[in-house]
Amino acid sequence: MSGWDEGAVYYSDQPQFPEAGDAATISPHAVLTKFKEFIRNFEIEQNCFPYREALLDNPKRLVVHLEDLLSFDSDLPSLIRSAPADYLPVFEKAAGEVLTGLKMREANEGGVMEEPLTRDVQILLTSREDPVSMRLLGAQYISKLVKISGISIAASRVKAKATYVFLVCKNCKKTREVPCRPGLGGAIVPRSCDNIPQPGEEPCPLDPWMVVPDRSQYVDQQTLKLQENPEDVPTGELPRNMLLSVDRHLVQTIVPGTRLTVMGIYSIFQASSSSNSHKGAVAIRQPYIRVVGLEDTNEASSRGPANFTPDEEEEFKKFADSQDVYKNICTKIAPSIFGHEDVKRAAACLLFGGSRKSLPDGVKLRGDINVLLLGDPSTAKSQFLKFVEKTAPIAVYTSGKGSSAAGLTASVIRDSSTREFYLEGGAMVLADGGVVCIDEFDKMRPEDRVAIHEAMEQQTISIAKAGITTVLNSRTSVLAAANPPSGRYDDLKTAQDNIDLQTTILSRFDLIFIVKDIRKYSQDKEIASHIIRVHASANKFSDENTDSKEDNWLKRYIQYCRARCHPRLSKDAAENLQRKYVTIRMDMKRRAHETGEAAPIPITVRQLEAIVRLSESLAKMRLSHEATPDDVDKAFKLFDTSTMDAARSGINQQINITGEMANEIKQAETQIKRRMGIGARLSERRLIEDLARMGMNDSMVRRALLIMHQRGEVEYQRERRSIVRKA
């Protein structure tokens, strides 16, 4: 037996780390040492150690730039990129040991003796490299470090994720700790107990381990859903989603609607299935990203990205200093559309926007401009919406008939696997910092239209559903297009009949355009010539790359102006605006007194703020930090040709009513009251047809209904299709 005990024992260090090229010869201890040296000794300039100082300022987390790691040691970034799940814990251990050493040095210098503590530090990675498209992530990226970008559309509640599970054997009471896989992975509990039974003792059965939750170790964990940026989605395809897992200090830092750049480990997990019928799919795994670094790129909060080249900035400043900047920008707005110069000016103001302000008492005033295009079909309203969606840095396009209140604001979704509720942002949330284009605005149900009242003025969306109470940001401009109730704008009807929208929603629009299809020989000839020329020259003389470069230049210039310029009104401009606003109010009061009816579009303090925003957007176009009286004059002119024209429309029709017309209207009122009892409901079309058989004039019947509606005697329902007698 002694022969078995003789001889030397040889051993080798064989770590369970994957090979990473030339770095395969590096031992775990050497990697740990290199990470510690990097945190201690990396310096930007003489005696400036950023990571050492950052660790002392915030001992819970340390943000590391991979470019700094590469300049310090070329092997470390390749190790982290190839096997981040193995080397990140080593990095965090190194950070904890460095922090402990720094704290002990501080304590010794201060003459205070402290017991050294093992500190947990979360390492967060960031890089200046370009993100990978979500559509290109495949099997070759599994367990590798990737960088993607998108919009967070949903966030779950915070859960407790076990890092170590404490187990107790039910038979012999032996204990052990089992580590859990990070992310969405679980713990691998052994099937048998490794305790050797004494003679006469009964051996431990199969699956004897029992989890003790109170003695296990936990961290906070949250799951997010990331969606592709709208501008990255190919035409005609649905946006892709990716599940994200964040833990520890990244929890509850992101709300739906935030634009993110994510650095993480592309991982897989087995999704739980409610049925056991999919036995053949045992090898199928669902991808997700375990986040190891988050960067908020939302332009509304970070004031836009600073990734403008010096050449671009010089070009933008040169353009801003040129003559007629306002005119040059308006010529770049929808050049394929003939005419509609005022609408193009409004679209330019909407794209640049005003300045968002925060008052000392915490109240925030919106800087985004809302525009409504109301008018006849075939007047290029939808074309304007499409152009703005393509040109705005952030934009979401939707149609009124296919949009619900939840789809526009936010919805509460129940997770099919965990059965818990989580928030999913709608169009107004996803377009935070950009533009929402809503076509067929008049086709929306009134209750859905009411849902965006708060989003249009306060620029927040309050949610109180299924136990979730929160406020989401929706700092967006709204560009809406609508048709009158009868399909076309009828000059024989009053403005109240043509603009069938509530006063509450109309007052939230800064500019309201009534776009009419005017039949004029010379104008029709020019429009026809322009459209034929556009169709004939499409893809013939113009290069698509040239058009895309022009659009991209305008988008970049808008982005630059919104990020770098936040103008305010000058003193002279403020006095000029005050005089003009008082004049408008007195003019509307005089007209209402003459006609005896209220204006269809109210002129309130919101319209005063609208002119302020328009003036600021005009100053922003030329990168000026001060809006001048000339800007106020241009803004007032645009406001006068849009909202004021709409408010004045139809009023003069009520002035010159002859005695004969008054008698006919009175007779029509009498017949309507005789035909409908109090509380009765009747179709407007049927009522007009019935009275027409009695010899009543259609226009007089409509005028009588309008007067009774203003007095509160009848009420329109179901989009003005039916009438209910109230009194």
Curated annotation (Swiss-Prot):
GO terms for biological process: DNA replication initiation. The keyword Mitochondrion does not apply. Its EC number is 3.6.4.12. Expressed in shoot apex and flower buds. It is found in: Nucleus; Cytoplasm. It catalyses: ATP + H2O = ADP + phosphate + H(+). GO terms for molecular function: ATP binding; ATP hydrolysis activity; DNA replication origin binding; helicase activity. CDD domains: MCM5. InterPro entries: MCM, MCM5, MCM5_C, MCM_CS, MCM_dom, MCM_lid, MCM_N, MCM_OB. ATP binds at residues 375-382. Residues 325-531 form the MCM domain. Pfam families: MCM (PF00493), MCM5_C (PF21933), MCM_lid (PF17855), MCM_N (PF14551), MCM_OB (PF17207). Its main location: nucleus. A motif (Arginine finger) lies at residues 507-510. PROSITE patterns: MCM_1 (PS00847), MCM_2 (PS50051). Component of the minichromosome maintenance (MCM) complex, a heterotetramer composed of MCM2, MCM3, MCM4, MCM5, MCM6 and MCM7. Interacts with EGT1. Belongs to the MCM family. This is DNA replication licensing factor MCM5. The gene is MCM5.
